[in-house]
Amino acid sequence: MPTLQQLVRKGRIQKHTKTKTPALNNSPQKRGICIRSYTITPKKPNSALRKVARVRLTSKLEITAYIPGIGHNIQEHSVLLIRGGRVKDLPGVRYQIIRGTRDVSGVTARRQSHSKYGTKKVKN
């Protein structure tokens, strides 16, 4: 244990935490262009065809981003907005595409959690 005088002289070393979304570079979102839209299969206990897109960000980095919701209109050269947030059963997918922004349409006929999928509230 250091003495008070040693702490005055040197101080304590700050622990550096590793970021979970390095491509965002401390931004809440980043814009990117879709390079390829495809499906991948999840890890062991789960079985599905999850929709993902390979995206080139404005910072020239290439990432894999998950496309949430049912159905999408993302094609090559679509402009996308990316946020952080991993998909637990897809290794290497640490980003998600924000629906209802730029060239990406919202999920059609979505009633619950509609704000997360870029859909307007249905008036009864």
From Swiss-Prot:
The keyword rRNA-binding applies. Its main location: plastid. CDD domains: Ribosomal_S12. GO terms for cellular component: plastid; small ribosomal subunit. GO terms for biological process: translation. Keywords: Plastid, Ribonucleoprotein, Ribosomal protein, RNA-binding, rRNA-binding. GO terms for molecular function: rRNA binding; structural constituent of ribosome. Pfam families: Ribosom_S12_S23. InterPro entries: NA-bd_OB-fold, Ribosomal_uS12, Ribosomal_uS12_bac. It is found in: Plastid. Part of the 30S ribosomal subunit. Belongs to the universal ribosomal protein uS12 family. With S4 and S5 plays an important role in translational accuracy. Located at the interface of the 30S and 50S subunits. PANTHER family: 30S RIBOSOMAL PROTEIN S12 FAMILY MEMBER (PTHR11652). This is Small ribosomal subunit protein uS12c. It comes from Helicosporidium sp. subsp. Simulium jonesii.
